[in-house]
Amino acid sequence: MSEIRLGLVVTEFNREITYAMEELAVQHAKDLGAKVVERVLVPGSFEVPLAVRKLLERDDIDAVVTLGAIIKGDTDHDQAIAQQAFRKIQDLMVEYGKPVALGISGPGMTRMEALERVHYAKRAVEAAVKMVRRLRELEGE
């Protein structure tokens, strides 16, 4: 079975959190025998789907991992952003037939809760790698 090639889409909003997630994801991909071939930084979670689409269009990307932290503010804006972004990410995964792992934590979190969930980046990488392997098995590779 050939090496699994991942693309990362990482939000710049709450960068101190997403930077830690990004570094953890890259290392965990290596530990699992996968390789991150492209990293794309986007301003926030709302912009994630467009970058996901661009990576899914590439032949050298087997799966995409999204990383971000949607923290609760004074309004319900975090809920609206998350709902729209998550739905579009799922739609893109089905449209392109390639795994897209959701490593965006939130909404409704405090900054402290987001920091406590940095390790969720590893779960997202694991999900992407597992799905690529399962799809390859289904396709007889």
Curated annotation (Swiss-Prot):
Annotated residues for binding of (2S)-2-hydroxy-3-oxobutyl phosphate: 74-75, 117
Pathway: Cofactor biosynthesis; riboflavin biosynthesis; riboflavin from 2-hydroxy-3-oxobutyl phosphate and 5-amino-6-(D-ribitylamino)uracil: step 1/2
Catalytic activity: (2S)-2-hydroxy-3-oxobutyl phosphate + 5-amino-6-(D-ribitylamino)uracil = 6,7-dimethyl-8-(1-D-ribityl)lumazine + phosphate + 2 H2O + H(+)
Gene3D superfamilies per UniProt: Lumazine/riboflavin synthase (3.40.50.960)
Residues annotated as binding 5-amino-6-(D-ribitylamino)uracil: 13, 45-47, 69-71, 102
GO terms for cellular component: riboflavin synthase complex
GO biological process, one term: riboflavin biosynthetic process
Active site residues of this protein: 77
EC main group: transferase
UniProt KW keywords: Riboflavin biosynthesis, Transferase
GO MF terms, alphabetically ordered: 6,7-dimethyl-8-ribityllumazine synthase activity
Domain of life: Archaea
Pfam families: DMRL_synthase (PF00885)
E.C. number(s) listed in UniProt: 2.5.1.78
InterPro entries: LS (IPR034964), LS/RS (IPR002180), LS/RS_sf (IPR036467)
Record has Transferase as a keyword: yes
Protein family per UniProt: Belongs to the DMRL synthase family.
Purpose: Catalyzes the formation of 6,7-dimethyl-8-ribityllumazine by condensation of 5-amino-6-(D-ribitylamino)uracil with 3,4-dihydroxy-2-butanone 4-phosphate. This is the penultimate step in the biosynthesis of riboflavin.
Entry protein name: 6,7-dimethyl-8-ribityllumazine synthase
Source organism of this protein record: Methanopyrus kandleri (strain AV19 / DSM 6324 / JCM 9639 / NBRC 100938)
Phylogenetic lineage: Archaea, Methanobacteriati, Methanobacteriota, Methanomada group, Methanopyri
